[in-house]
């Protein structure tokens, strides 16, 4: 019985201790002034684990294309490096002084060869021209000999008449002044005819000057009557005006006395 009791006692005591430990953290969490206490420091192992996990996640989340672009941008040369490379390439491609001299010598030798060929061609052409000139001279001498023979046949070395063709030069005839005179006379005659038809414009003939004086007198009389008619019309208007009648009567009486 005693052994059974011993076995049962520790079984009952052990859960009591566990209950006390489990209740202790619950009381701490429910405390009102726990925020004033210092926070528990995180261990360094935990920080390293968190950082490694974060890096692993970021590496998985980043796409491969973005990583490749980033690496290319890092490896790209700067503007200064590009300019330096271009300058080096230009200097490498530039020919040296020896190359330039070699090229100039080769070009001068080729030009001299061409000049030599041209000189030979010119000499050959000159020879051909000289030969052709001699041939032309011989032909001219033959022609001159034929012409001399023809001249010997004719007296005094005259050429046949068929060789010389007379050249006739025709000059345009100048316009004569006399051609314009009949037109002027015709115009004058026409104007004279018109003037003869008008009264008072008849010409005086050279022989009978006294006979043509009568129409001049006849034409003068109607011309003198025109101002009298005008004066009479004006006098009639003036007579109608008041204060002008007395003056006109006195003037008329004076005119009648003078006429008598």
Curated annotation (Swiss-Prot):
One of its GO terms (molecular function) is copper ion binding. Induction: By dehydration, cold stress and abscisic acid (ABA). Induction by dehydration occurs after 1 hour and increases to a maximum after 10 hours. Cold stress induction peaks at 1 hour and 5 hours after start of cold exposure. The modification Phosphoserine is found at residue 61. Sequence repeats lie at residues 184-204, 227-247. One of its GO terms (cellular component) is extrinsic component of membrane. Keywords: Acetylation, Phosphoprotein, Repeat, Stress response. Residues 1-187, 197-216, 240-260 are annotated as: Disordered. Residues 184-247 are annotated as: 2 X 21 AA repeats, Lys-rich. Residues 26-44, 67-102, 130-140, 148-162, 176-187, 197-207 have a biased composition (Basic and acidic residues). The modification N-acetylalanine is found at residue 2. One of its GO terms (biological process) is response to cold. In stems, cauline leaves, roots and flowers. Low levels found in maturing seeds. Absent in dry seeds. Belongs to the plant dehydrin family. This is Dehydrin ERD10. It comes from Arabidopsis thaliana. The lineage of its organism: Eukaryota, Viridiplantae, Streptophyta, Embryophyta, Tracheophyta.
């Amino acid at each position: 019985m005693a052994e059974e009791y011993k076995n049962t006692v520790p079984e009952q005591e052990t859960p009591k201790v566990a209950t006390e430990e489990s209740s202790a953290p619950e009381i701490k969490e429910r405390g009102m002034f726990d925020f004033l206490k210092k926070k528990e420091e995180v261990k360094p192992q935990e920080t390293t684990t968190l950082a490694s996990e974060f890096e692993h996640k970021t590496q998985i989340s980043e796409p491969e294309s973005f990583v490749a672009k980033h690496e290319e941008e890092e490896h790209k040369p700067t503007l200064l490096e590009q300019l330096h490379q271009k300058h080096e390439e230009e200097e490498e491609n530039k020919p040296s002084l020896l190359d330039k001299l070699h090229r100039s010598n080769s070009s001068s030798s080729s030009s001299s060869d061409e000049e030599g060929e041209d000189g030979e061609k010119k000499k050959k052409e000159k020879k051909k021209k000289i030969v052709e000139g001699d041939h032309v001279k011989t032909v001219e001498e033959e022609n001159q000999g034929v012409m001399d023979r023809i001249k010997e046949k004719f007296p005094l070395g005259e050429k046949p008449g068929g060789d010389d063709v007379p050249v006739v030069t025709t000059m345009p005839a100048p316009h004569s002044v006399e051609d314009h005179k009949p037109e002027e006379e015709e115009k004058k005659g026409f104007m004279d005819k018109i003037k003869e038809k008008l009264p008072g414009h008849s010409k005086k003939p050279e022989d009978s000057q006294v006979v043509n004086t009568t129409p001049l007198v006849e034409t003068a009389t109607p011309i003198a009557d025109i101002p009298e008619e005008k004066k009479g019309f004006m006098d009639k208007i003036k007579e109608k005006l008041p204060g002008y009648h007395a003056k006109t009567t006195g003037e008329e009486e004076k005119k009648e006395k003078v006429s008598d």
